[in-house]
Each structure stands twice: as C-alpha cells, then as structure tokens.
Amino acid sequence: MFTLTKALEKALLQHFIYMKVNIAYAINKPFPFFEALRDNSFITERMYKESLEACQNLVPLSKVVHNILTSLEQTFHPSVLLTLFSKVNLREYPSLVAIFRSFRNVGYTYEEKNRPPLTLLEDLANPAEGCSLQTLLPPPRPQISLPSHLSSAPRVCDPRATAQPIIEILDEQPSPSPRAVPLLGCIQEGKTTPVSSRDHQRKDKEDSREMPHSPSGPESVVKDDSPAANDLEMAREVPCTPANKKARRKKRPNWSNSKRRRQKKKPRQDEMMGVASPGHGVQEKLKAVSRRTLWKDDSSTNVKEVTKTQRTRMRRAQTSNSQEISKEASKTSGRKRPSTARRTTQVPEKTKNDAVDFSPTLPVTCGKAKGTLFQEKLKQGASKKCIQNEAGDWLTVKEFLNEGGRATSKDWKGVIRCNGETLRHLEQKGLLFFTSKSKPQKKGA
C-alpha cells in the first residue's frame, strides 16, 4: 500500500489554500455541503448552525463557505478532500469537477515511477467511511505485453494518463516515416493486434506468426465498456491499421491523376479561347494557373510553389502604389502654386502696412474728407473733437462723417479709413486701441 509523504501533504495543503475562493464560489447551495462536513466531524454542530443562520441573514454563501474552509485549513488532512470531492458533491456541484482535476494533477507531480498515477491518494480514505478515490477515478489499464525486440520501445498504457510521456515520445521520434515511428498496437472491438515496423516484420516473421490475434490473458487483452474508452479506441483505429494506410496511398494517385487530367484539358481550352479573343486570353491563362493544384510534400503540408497570379498581384500592387505616390506629389505641387500667387498679391498690402506709422496721429479719410486722427483724444470718447481736417478745424467723429457724406452710417470704424484699411480692421489686428464707447452717435440720436 502507498504511504502518504509529507511533501505530497504539504503540496495538497498549499493547493487547498490557493483554491479556497474557487471552491467557495463553486458551492451554490448549502445542502449537502454543510451536512457532509458535519456528518464526517470536520466541523462542529455549533459551526454548522452558525453557518445556516448566516445564510438566513442574507450573508453571501460564498463568504460563509470560505470561512469554513479557513477553519479546515488549520486542521488540514487529505481526508478532507475525499469528503469535499465525493460523488454526491460532484453531482450536486458541477463546478467542483474542474477543481477536483487540479488536485489530481498535483498528485501526479508527486507520484512514484512504478505506480500508476490514479492510485496516488489510495490510502487517504478512512476505512470507517467506506469511500476512497478509487471509486471516483477509473482503474488503470493493464500494460500490453510486447515481444522482446520491442521491449526498448516506448509503451502507451493508459489513454487518460498525463500528456508528458506522450510529448517525450514525440520529441524522441520527430520523423513521420514508418521506420522512426514503430506502431505499438491497435485496439479494435476489445481485441489487441500488436504491429511492428516493416524492418521488424522482415526480421522477425516467426515471432509475429506465433503471437495470437485474440489472446485470452489479462496482460494482452484490454477491454473497457466505458463510452470514453470506446471513443478513444474508435479514434485510434484509423491511424493504427496498416490496411487503411495502404488504401489511402492507393487513393492519392487516383485523385492526383484525375486533377492532372483536368489541368491538361483546361489550358487547351484556354488557348482556344485566347485565339478567339486575344483581349481575354491573358486573364483566362492566369485563372488556369491559379486553379492548378499546388504540389505538396508527403512529410509536410507546406506549399512548395508560388503561383503566377500572386506575382502579378504583387506587381499590380507595386504599380498602384507608385501611381498613388505620383498623384500625391502632383497634388502637393499643385497646392503650392496658388499659395505663391497669393503671396505675390499680398506683397503690396504688406508694403502699405509697413509704410503706415501708427503714431499718436494717423492720416484718415472718409469719402472725400481728409484729416488727422489724434488717438489720445479719441481714447477720451468719440464725442470729443479728435480729428483735425485739412482746413485746421477740430471735428468730432460724427462731424467728420457729415463732412465726408457718410452721416447715415452707424459704424464709424468701418467707414473711416487709414491708408486704405478701416479702423475696425486695424483694431482687430491689435494695431489700434480705442475706448469702450465705440458708438457715441447712438446717444446723440
């Protein structure tokens, strides 16, 4: 019998602490989780009643379960896992199945070399309880007896074993040829038929004849009535039987020959179409080339040939990109030309602005009237006499508008000009600053 080691018990405890929250959320109803822990004396009657009262007081069930698991952590024993992952709990709480598998994987890491992985927690059950992990897990399959010349080859004993041995076998034998991958055996309808490579069949024909096809001993016969095992057997029938491989090898040339015949016929038809209509001949030839089957290697499914259609597509993409680049360049060059023309038209305006000296006195015009504007007086208000005409008389803004024939204008800043530009335009540019009383003529009206 297998004895529990401290390392395995410590690993199970650490995993139990790690999975407490997941277990708490997997329990979605109090019964039968609380009752199973109470009946197996893992929690006291007092804790059982307090937990039920907490659930009645609308405390979240996951929090109550987490508190119970925390108390079990202090007095942890692997037998707690047997009660937690019993058949009843796994049926009532389906979310526990994935958690149970994680605990089983922890046991696999600490299993012994000569023991199957499914009997790791064999002695964890209490005999008085009458349950063990053997009732939860399927029994391991017996090993298939092989000839002496195949004893050094890797063996597959259990389809439900971990994936690590299978990965090691694949790493040791990477080539898919029949010499590098010996066929260990085939399972069909409850019978086993061990098959070796072609070299071993030629050397040891007598040994293969002596081996029975339907032995009755437990070592060579593997039977499993479970549906999962039958599915695995049916899935493995196709790659194991050499007859199916031969049939596939025979079918491949027929399929490829029929395809090749079609390919030979299609180019002839395309050539005939090309003579009739030379405009569409190139397109039809490209379609025929794209339709032909690509040659594939038997050892890998990677495509070994690049069709001409892909090359033509690449060339078209390159030409389209070059055309787009040329169009963009022409657009950018076309955009720059009107900007230069605008700059040439704006040059005399800048010379006008540069000639103006924005001193306290500005030459202003309003229609035919001309005068000089004094900014310091204008800041006091538009009703002040701030403009001096050519005769030397001082005028207000309204009087200057009357003299220029623009008395009806309400926007005096848009009428009075200084060197071709209105005072409002100069004010917006920040070249002039006036008082906040912009329209005093309204007050006079």
Swiss-Prot record:
Keyword Transmembrane on entry: no
GO molecular function, one term: DNA binding
Domain of life of the native organism: Eukaryota
Biased composition (Basic and acidic residues): 197-212
SAND domain sequence ranges: 353-433
Assigned keywords, A-Z: Apoptosis, DNA-binding, Immunity, Innate immunity, Nucleus, Phosphoprotein, Transcription, Transcription regulation
In-chain residues carrying the UniProt-annotated modification Phosphoserine: S175, S177, S226, S277
Cellular component GO terms held in the UniProt record: nucleus
Cellular localization per UniProt: Nucleus
Disease linked to the protein: Defects in Sp110 are a cause of severely impaired resistance to infection by M.tuberculosis.
Protein name (database record): Sp110 nuclear body protein
Organism: Mus musculus (Mouse)
Gene: Sp110
